[in-house]
């Protein structure tokens, strides 16, 4: 849908500085990118069909509205940019990729409410929580969950057996080796620390996308989210909770 509109010049395209660019500029950049990183020379007449399978990422300029009282989230997309993603190495531990942003689209809000294409898959993304939204959202999340005022699920969507299982998620257990200088013996011990609202630094979101075939406007509907906490200076962990967005809380879970 997007590529057809771009090829037929039915939509204006821009670079990362929001300067309008022409189709020839994008096509030349794609040809140079493929020749450099895949060693293949592609013709202008086959560019868009050739790169379609390699569109592996989108960058969005979007706004997130938070309703702190009931943890409801809503996204509004202002602009987006598709990326070519080429894997040079993929082994489960290290993903070595090269990426190329193609163009930015700033669609107008669609007046046609019928001509939408619904992406069939649930899209998973990570959204960073930053001040000033982080603290009231995280604080109320802790309050609602710990007081059992909102229904939560395991990350896979299954229900918890007991409320104690939910409470235990807010405590991190670490194993460490204790060395006794007097005896010279090493003992494996456990330490416990509480997860606090300040530790929640991001949420993993499951969402549905739809795109208007005429205006190319993209709308997102958030189905659920999973809080992520700061595990150490370099890593974050999954708290172990799936919280459905307000519109999906009393429906059959997907």
Positions of the model-derived regions?
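A domain-level signal for the mature, folded cores of soluble proteins
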Residues: 1-69, 86-91, 107-214, 232-235, ...
